[in-house]
Amino acid sequence: MRPSTLRSFALRLVLALAATTAVFALLERPFVEALRPLYRLQVYWLAPEFRVNALTVADRKGETVVQLDVEYARDATVHGIQIPKGAGLTVSTLAGYALIHPIVLLSVLLAWPGLDTRRRAWGVVAALLLVLLLEAWDLPLMLLGAVRDAILAKVAPGQWSAAVAWMRFLDGGGRMALPLAAAAVLIAVLVTRAPSRPGLEARPRVRPARPEQ
């Protein structure tokens, strides 16, 4: 990428980030509310041992949070410790985390140079599908990680948990890295699979025959 193109991309990226951040900041609550069924389904799929009593979006001390209330659906054993059916807890995480994926992914896509309108439009559609995938592996895992962390802190401190490890990965920079990686893959596909225009296929050049002397 040439320096002039790089500067143009950086400027467009700043403008795209400002615009998408403003839009999603206004739509934070309805956006996260719309994702609640996805979050609930993911929690049920990843942790069938829990019964989800409630998964809500709430305001707490001026911040919007996603709150999960679960209890054990049956008697369970965790690292040799018996946990009775009905034992539960409530955890929460910031709803604003859900905004990072669409803001980063869409901003990079909208700012990237060299994409025509058609490819950029298809890219936005694909980006929205990727956002759903990223969302399914963010807040639900944050909430489950908090649940597992709280349980392990009581019954088996220091024990490893996949949900806790993923939660820490997201908090340690993974939440920003995932949409950037998704944007890179999507842009690579859009660039390498550019649709050919009809009527512009390359044709072999035919040189006129020289007259015999």
Regions found by a protein language model. Give the residues of each.
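Mid-length scaffold segments of soluble, non-membrane domains
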Residues: 100-133
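Individual transmembrane alpha-helix segments
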Residues: 63-108
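Alpha-helical transmembrane segments and their helix-start/interface "positive-inside/aromatic belt" motifs
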Residues: 3-18, 118-129
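N-terminal signal-anchor transmembrane alpha helix
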Residues: 7-55
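Structural signal for the C-terminal ends of transmembrane alpha-helices
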Residues: 26-27, 109-117, 187-196
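Juxtamembrane non-transmembrane "cap" segments at the membrane-aqueous interface
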Residues: 136-157
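Primarily interfacial, aromatic-capped hydrophobic alpha-helices that serve as membrane anchors
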Residues: 158-208, 212-213
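Hydrophobic alpha-helical membrane-insertion segments
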Residues: 18-29, 125-142
